[in-house]
């Protein structure tokens, strides 16, 4: 029974398993059918997708084109809005322009003009016919605004520009000359910057306005000093020699330097760097023209009083050259203008060197009479005084000397091809040239020319060589003294050999009379006679005793002739007008030539009149005293 139960259980399980298998098979069949349906749907969907893609592709491209077109339309609408905006805001900007920069405020005014300019540029770029009237209105407003800016620029500038200032107030107190206030400079600079940035041709107009306003201020401030420079050159005495620093040109130049540098600072603060030079030169032009006129007047005065006022030309040359250098260093401008103004005076200064030499030569040549006592003439001291005065202007003269070259003052000197249109710089000078050395050569040439001319005249106009010798020696001594007692000594101390040569020549001319006197002191000594002189002491008594009557008469005659000639020489020597040094030199030279001869002759023959003094007027002591008196 248990077996049966077991078999029945197994059968039931099998039936249940078969039933489950049948169910699974049924589900699998349904799944297979469903899969086939899905695959069929996918195939249809793929076919449909391809059809849709074929249709949607062109639609997508068209959509993109429509999007771009839409964006373009939006941009056009925005541009139209912007183009309409200036027209809409024109009334507001016009109100600002009409009010002007003073009331509206410069920054607001400039911003308004800039907006108008930007709007006009955009309208011109669009070139829409509908905007033509608006563009015309904007152009009119901009033109009016620029005109008001120029007027405001001039108004501000004139408001801060006095008619003139008193330069001496700033010079004497060592104060800087006034410049424009910083707030006004800022306003002027803003206006100029706008004009330059907008490429408006008003920049040149503003520069013209600036020069037109500030130029007369500079000229008026310097006018009195220019007049003073001319007036102080006028002479109360025609023969008065110009003294350094007595003309007003130094103060004039000092004021010009201060005013010009202050004005240059103004120009640099207002205008662009590339415009500084042109505007500064234009502003200073009137003052420079006045200075040039002043220098021409002074030059005419100097040329008409060259002997006494040539030194003013040297001083002016130094002053203006220094002014040019300072302004060139500070501004880089005006060198050419100042050189052109100085040129007439500088040329006069250069030519004066040769002209003064020629004038001295002419004065020597015109001498018709010379002092009969050999006294010096004023021309000698006048010539040396001129050289002494020149030393006081050694710096400008050194510059001129280098410019004309060594010997350039001589009549036949070449011009060396140097240009005279500019103030000389170091580059224009000969390398190694020494202006002081060249000037010393000029001094020596002057002295040599003077002495040569006087020597020739003395030979013609004076009665004797002795008087000519006195005259020349006096001249030499005066020249030497005036060199040694002045600043000329530093230049000529070791170069006065020519004076020593002329002194010896003059001494020889004067003491030539000693030859005539010495003839009376020569005797004939016969060495072949028994009474010839011995080497021991001279015995006058024995010598006289040994003379024959004819020889004694000759000795007496020699004493007599010597006495007369010697007294005459002493008398004339004392009558001559001699400088102390000349009298000493001549007296000593005569003593050296005659005293030894006379003492020898006296030693041998003084017993000829046995001490009566009839023939032997002087013994050795008395004649020594006379010789000593000649030198004192």
From Swiss-Prot:
| GO cellular component, as recorded | cellular bud neck; exocyst
In terms of InterPro entries, this protein maps to: Cullin_repeat-like_dom_sf (IPR016159), Exo70 (IPR004140), Exo70_C (IPR046364)
Q: List where in the cell it is found.
A: Bud; Bud neck
An example GO BP is:
protein transport
Q: State one Pfam family annotation.
A: Exo70_C
GO molecular function terms listed in the Swiss-Prot or TrEMBL record:
phosphatidylinositol-4,5-bisphosphate binding
Q: Which domain of life is it from?
A: Eukaryota
Give UniProt keywords alphabetically: Exocytosis, Protein transport, Transport
The UniProt family comment states: Belongs to the EXO70 family.
Briefly, what is this protein's role?
Answer: Involved in the secretory pathway as part of the exocyst complex which tethers secretory vesicles to the sites of exocytosis. Also plays a role in the assembly of the exocyst.
In its UniProt entry, what is this protein called?
Exocyst complex protein EXO70
Which organism was this protein described from?
Gibberella zeae (strain ATCC MYA-4620 / CBS 123657 / FGSC 9075 / NRRL 31084 / PH-1)
Its organism's taxonomic lineage begins at: Eukaryota, Fungi, Dikarya, Ascomycota, Pezizomycotina
Q: Which gene encodes it?
A: EXO70
